[in-house]
Amino acid sequence: MSVTPEVKSRGMKFAEEQLLKHGWTQGKGLGRKENGITQALKVTLKQDTHGVGHDPAKEFTDHWWSDLFNKTAANLVVDSGKDGVQIRRLSKETTQRSHSKPSLLYQKFVKTATLTSGEEKPDRDLESCSDVDNREPIPPKILTDEMLLKACEGRTAHKAARIGITMKAKLARLEAQEQAFLARLKGSKDVGTSQPLTDSEPSQKKKKRRKQKEEEEAATTEKSLGEELLEHTDKSFRKSKKKKKKKKDEREGTAIGSEEEEAAGVCGPAELSTEQSDQSSRKKKKRRRRHHEEEEEMGVCDEGGRDVTGGPKAVNSGADTDPWRSSKKRQTCEEDLDTQDEEDKDDLTKKERKVRKKDKKKRQQYCEEVLDVSNKDDGRTWEAEDGGERSQPHPKARAKKKKRKTD
């Protein structure tokens, strides 16, 4: 039969390691005399109410009465002599338990007196106790200073006083200070009782003076705050003036832009931080797009007769013009300028309006020049923009050449 080795738990292994460090070996018992247990207690699954290490078969295997009889018999010695038989004990150990009777003072009623026909009859024990108390007074446990002096025969912790060195001068000085302090207190009380009315008048005057001082301090603080506010407003006003000047210079610089930006109706955008500035910039972009589309439809040309789109230029070959057509174009240009100015009036300041008036005049001049060029379209000849490039014939001439080739 093969014996299965015991599987030791982690706790058992740790306990064995600790015991081995201290010189224990397997098979030895615990304790100084090595008479303790040799095997560790093992806890199994409990399904009863018994405690740990309980042996249910102990009551059948442990014969305690026989052990007790043998122990008492061994302790007794029987001596037989002339006078008879004597029993003697070897040890003073008692085989019986000494059951001490508990005191019943706080468990039951204590009898102190008996009542006989409505009269109290005290016990003799109490009377004897009272007589003893009257004869010998019990000294207190905590002694007073006087009792300590008597017991120590007038000695104190000041060892120099035993030789004769005392602090009479210091004690006299302290007593004089205390008397002077008490005299001052008594004098102040007497003055307070004798003159209650005279003290009330100066107290009212003091209150008035305090109020006046507080009012003066409040006035001075208000003045200082007012001066600080004025200085702050002056500085902010100066800063705003400087900012306005800078903005004005920027707007004038943008207004004197290139001719192409003027043709497209470009104006220097005023950098505004509010929501109105954002709305005005959006409106300007829409107007520029419209203006560009109208110029492309009308075939706007610049001062030199060059088309804005960069295509071939038309040169006037005759003096014939259409007055009705030119007047109509001028009206449309003027209406566009008026609508732009009316929409911008609400969002602009006085300084910006002046700048816009200058721009309006320049636009009007440019429109008049463009219209003068566009009215001369009856007899035109098509040429290249640059002199070095090849001249292009009129589209009608091209059509005639194609017909000739086909014939």
Curated annotation (Swiss-Prot):
Phosphothreonine: modified positions: 4, 116
The keyword Iron-sulfur is assigned to this record: no
InterPro entries to which the protein is assigned, alphabetical: G_patch_dom (IPR000467), PINX1 (IPR050656)
Basic residues: compositionally biased ranges: 238-248, 282-291, 351-364, 393-407
UniProt feature, compositional bias: Basic and acidic residues: 118-138, 224-237, 374-392
Residues recorded as bearing Phosphoserine in the entry: 128, 130, 258
Biased composition range(s): Polar residues: 191-201
UniProt superkingdom: Eukaryota
Keyword Ubl conjugation: yes
GO biological process: hematopoietic progenitor cell differentiation
Pfam families named among the record's database cross-references: G-patch
Positions with biased composition (Acidic residues): 334-346
Region ranges (Disordered): 116-138, 187-407
Positions bearing the Glycyl lysine isopeptide (Lys-Gly) (interchain with G-Cter in SUMO2) cross-link: 46
GO molecular function list: nucleic acid binding
Residue ranges constituting the G-patch domain according to the UniProt record: 11-57
PANTHER family recorded: G PATCH DOMAIN CONTAINING PROTEIN, G PATCH DOMAIN-CONTAINING PROTEIN 4
Record protein name field: G patch domain-containing protein 4
Lineage, highest ranks first: Eukaryota, Metazoa, Chordata, Craniata, Vertebrata
